[in-house]
Every structure is written in C-alpha cells, then in structure tokens.
Regions:
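Catalytic domains of riboflavin
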Residues: 1-398
Length: 398
C-alpha cells in the first residue's frame, strides 16, 4: 500500500514539473478537475505568455469560454466588480464583469484583440482606466491560497503560473468535443496525445504543493489535563492558506523509531461537542484518547475545517470517516497533507493508526509516513444503521 501511494505522489510531482516546464515556454497544458465537480478539462497557459495564436487555438480546438484567472489583489487593483453579488452557480465560479482593452483593439472579439486585452490586464503597471467594461474577455477571481483553498481550474491555472515563476494569472478554456458535448477524461487523453500536451489534474497540484510547501506552523504550546486521562502537551498550529487552527495532543515520549499510536481526527460539531446519537465522531475521539491513555504514549491531531453554517448540523458521517457535504477527495487529500505536516513537525515517522478507513492510510503514506499498523475503532449501532440506510452496502474495513 505504501509503495502504491508513494508512486502516486511521485507521478504527481513529475507531472507538475513537466507542466511547469511547458508553462514557462508559453505552451498550454490540460488541467482536469475532480469527478465530483465539473469533471472536465481546461486548456491552461500563463496569461503573460498569451499570443493571438494561442487564443485562436483555444477558440478552434477548445471551443469553450476563454477566461482570464486573476488573483484577488489584481482584481481589486483593476477595480473589477463581481458579475453578481449573490453567486448561485454550482461551484461558485467567481466571474467579474467582462473586459476589453481601452486602446489597441477593434471589435474586441478577434484572437489578436483578446490576446491584447489579456496582456493589458496582467501588465505590471495596469490600472482601471486601461480597461473598458463590458468586453470579450471574462476574468475569474481565484481564491487566495490557490488549490489548497478551492479545488478549481481557476485556482489551478494561477498556481501553475506562480509555481513556474511567472505572474500569477492564467488563461483557461474548457475543452469540448466536435459534437458540442463536454470532453471527459477518455476524450482528454486522446486530445493530449494528438496535440502533444501534458495532462494533469488539480489533485496533482495539491500533492505537489503539499510536498513542496510548508503550510502549517506551530504557534502555541501548553499543558492540558484531561479528566481521568492525565496530562497531555497541546500544540496549536496555524495555517498559511486559511484561518483554521489545528491542535495536536501528545502524551508521553513519542521520540524514537517505535511506531506511535496516532489518531488524525476531523473536528465535528455535532459529534464531538453536541454528542449526537446519529454521529460516532465523539465516540471515536474518546476511544482514541482511551487507547493512548492505556498505552502511555500517543498523538491525537484534531483538524479544523471551515464548514458552511448551513452544513454544520448535517454532519452524520460514521466514525469520522464518511463524507460531510462538499467534502470531496481533493478536500481529504488536503487534510491528509496538513495532518502529515503536523505529524512530521512532532518528529513522527512510523504510526499505529487509529482508523477504520484505509483511505487515511494511503493518504498519510503519500507523505512519507509509514503506517506500521491499522487499529480499528468500534462503531455504535445507531450511526451504522443510519449510514446503511442512506447508501447501498459496500466493502469497508472495520
């Protein structure tokens, strides 16, 4: 399992490095998102490298809407208001008003005109008066923090440009088939081969950044006495990409090569704090603490996540392993990376992992942590019954 997960990580690193080399040369790559999102591929290039020929290729072969991904600071500098204030689109794609260069264009729609508009918008000294509104180029606001905050091609294109050492702005265009349908992965593989392009996913960029960037930093340390379980050292960690504060609770001496009893736990309001009978999160957390108390050493990492208010009371996932609303594989991948960085900061390398979910093992091993043993936690009957009623049975390690 470890070899497979590490190979996946190695493949992602290699793919992103190939893509960055292409981006630096002013070439395009194909960036796919997750099957849980739009399940599509976009042509992507660095905005500062755009040419009329590139825009024409996107219009001719991509066939989708040609957009300009910009960071929030650039959007503010150019004084570009959002297209709508109440965004009700499925994936909260943040369109601003459309734009046109104030000078140097004719009708604005030609490949040359659109390339010129993009060049004007991303120029280092660009100002609001350089652009007319509306126009034929559609800017998108990328979230600060890139794919580690929002897992879309908008953020992916900006991350690729930034990681390539270029201005953080990208030009993207959805790829459609000749018959007008959206190109899915099999179509995108053929397209990439035909046009000799690198094909990578947003998940590849997430893995690359989690491997190459330090995203958490230790910001505090204190002693904590748990009722009936003695003393723990509590370490708090801040995030460089959002406002989340994570906590690691350490008992005993965790140094050395012996595997350490470890629980990586997603914080859950309903289960951990409110004690819902329909959620086993609190029970799983207490079991983890009890196991660590009995062993005399171990670590519990509690990961905070900014869950939308409307979803906070919908968390009826079993044993802290099931999905909460909007919790896709890319979100889990990001959590695994943050959890792994915290464990590495504590000096851990080999784990006895308290989990019922094999995905957690694969996820943590992707970041060079060895899971020497999986220790399952028991489930109460009520959450199991509720989850079973919601979805068809499937194989699961319990």
């Amino acid at each position: 399992m470890a070899r497979s997960s590490r190979k996946h990580e190695t493949d992602s690193i290699s793919l992103v490095e190939q893509a960055l080399a292409e981006i630096r040369k002013g070439r395009m790559v194909i960036l796919t998102d997750d099957e849980d999102r739009e399940n599509e591929g976009d042509l992507v290039m660095a905005a500062e490298k755009v040419t009329p020929e590139a825009i024409n290729f996107m219009a001719t072969h991509g066939r989708g809407l040609i957009c300009l991904s910009l960071v929030e600071e650039r959007i503010r500098r150019l004084n570009l208001p959002l297209m709508v204030q109440d965004n009700t689109s499925s994936f909260q794609t943040a369109f601003t008003v459309s734009i046109e260069a104030s000078q140097g264009v004719s009708t604005g729609i030609s490949a040359a005109d659109r390339a010129h508009t993009i060049k004007v918008a991303v120029a280092p000294n660009a100002k609001p008066s350089d652009l007319a509104r509306p126009g034929h180029v559609f800017p998108l606001r990328a979230r600060d923090g890139g794919v580690l905050v929002r897992t879309g091609q908008t953020e992916g294109s900006v991350d690729l440009a930034r990681l390539a050492g270029l201005s953080p702005a990208g030009v993207i265009c959805e790829i459609m088939n000749p018959d007008g349908t959206m190109a899915r992965r099999p179509d995108l593989v053929k397209f990439a081969r035909k046009h000799k392009m690198v094909l990578l996913s947003v998940a590849d960029i997430i893995r690359y950044r989690l491997e190459r960037e330090r995203l958490v930093k230790r910001i505090g340390e204190t002693k904590l006495e748990r009722r009936g379980q003695g003393a723990f050292l509590a370490y708090t960690y801040g995030s460089d990409v959002d406002s989340a504060v994570h906590v690691a609770l350490v008992k005993g001496d965790i140094s050395g090569r012996e595997p350490v009893l470890t629980r990586v736990h997603r914080a859950c309001l309903v289960g951990d704090q409110l004690g819902s009978a329909g959620c086993d999160c609190g029970s799983q957390l207490e079991q983890a603490f009890q196991r660590i108390q009995e062993a005399g050493r171990g670590v519990v990492v509690v990961l905070q996540r900014d869950v939308p208010a409307k979803n906070r009371l919908q968390c009826t996932h079993v044993s802290n392993e099931e999905s909460v609303p909007g919790h896709n594989d890319q979100t889990r991948l990001r959590e695994f990376g943050v959890g792994a960085q915290i464990l590495k900061d504590l000096g851990l390398s080999r784990l006895r992992l308290l989990t019922n979910n094999p995905k957690k093992i694969v996820g943590l091993e992707s970041y060079s942590l060895e899971v020497a043993e999986q220790i399952p936690l028991t489930l109460s009957a009520e959450p199991v019954r509720r989850v079973a009623a919601r979805r068809p049975p499937r194989r699961k390690t319990l």
